Amino acid sequence: MDLSSLRPAAGAVKNKKRVGRGQGSGNGTTAGKGNKGQQARSGYQKPINEGGQVPVYRRLPKFGFTSLQRKPIKTLNLSQLEDWIQDGLITGEEISVYDLKALCSGSYADYFKILGNGEITTAIKITAHFFSKSAEEKIIKAGGQVIKAYRTLEEASKIRDLSVEEALLKPKAKLVKRVKKSAKP
């Protein structure tokens, strides 16, 4: 088997439907638009106007918003970590953010949260950004250690004074809002 012998799966690639190319094609003459009239002409769009009825976009209320500061968080259960340990994907007692990023291949997330679903039998030292209470308790009960990271890998790599491992664990500085003192009378 080599690269030249690879083919897409059956049914994965469809031919483009070419309309208006003769009656024998099945999509000729009217090109799938039916017979004459406004809907068969170019520029036709389905109307939003619903007559005197209140349109659907006004009937339904506005709901919520999308936060621009949202942190994409990848959640992992203890059962998943235990499976990785049993399969030999995790070797040793220490699991870093690098390991989590590598094991969750294709993950868009910058932050990792460990959840307490399942059991863990191995004593591990794990570094992640967030832990649920139950996950933290189960890891410590198994003889492990929980370390909270404060930064993403990208942020940590930009700090020049520290190694990436040290920078991950360094808390971010908090912005302190200063109150202006009133002018003296």
From Swiss-Prot:
Keyword rRNA processing in annotation: no
BP term (GO), one: translation
SUPFAM superfamilies reported in the protein's UniProt record: Ribosomal proteins L15p and L18e
Biased composition, class Gly residues, residue ranges: 21-35
Keyword Metal-binding found: no
Quaternary organization: Part of the 50S ribosomal subunit.
Role noted for this protein: Binds to the 23S rRNA.
Stated name of the protein: Large ribosomal subunit protein uL15
Record gene name: rplO
